[in-house]
Amino acid sequence: TRAARKTGIEIHPGATIGHGLFIDHGHGVVIGETAIVGNNVTLYQGVTLGGTGKQKGKRHPTIEDNVMVGCGAKVLGDITIGANSMIGAGSVVLNDVPPNSTVVGVPGRVVKRDNVRIPSADLVQVHLPDPVMNDIQQLKDTVARLVKHMEE
């Protein structure tokens, strides 16, 4: 449509849109045919509320009231994003999200629910394996063994 060409926002005419939808920096926003968007939802640039191509009938997400979807996030399939939730920028959400949750990552994971952080080993990023340091440590160990062997 002409509006989509001017704004970069594509909303299928079959989508159901609630009151107070706010699309900030809307270029690249896509809302699919069977999507349902609740009241007071905020979408940032590059958001896709799309299908996975595997379903018939209802194949796009339902976004409940007061949800914020960060830039570049993809919410795909016949899933529900619960009220008062936040989807982090760049996330790919393929499963239902409970109300009052924060989701980040690829695939999207709930990291906060009802304002309480969810502990997860997957979320600790300060103890990630470093293959280069592992190789250096192996070399150091080998050198130490060789030096000890030569001293004997």
What are these regions (language model features)?
Residues 58-75, 106-152:
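C-terminal segments of enzyme domains that contribute to small-molecule binding surfaces
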Residues 4-111:
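Structural signal for interior beta-strand "rungs" in well-ordered beta-sheet cores
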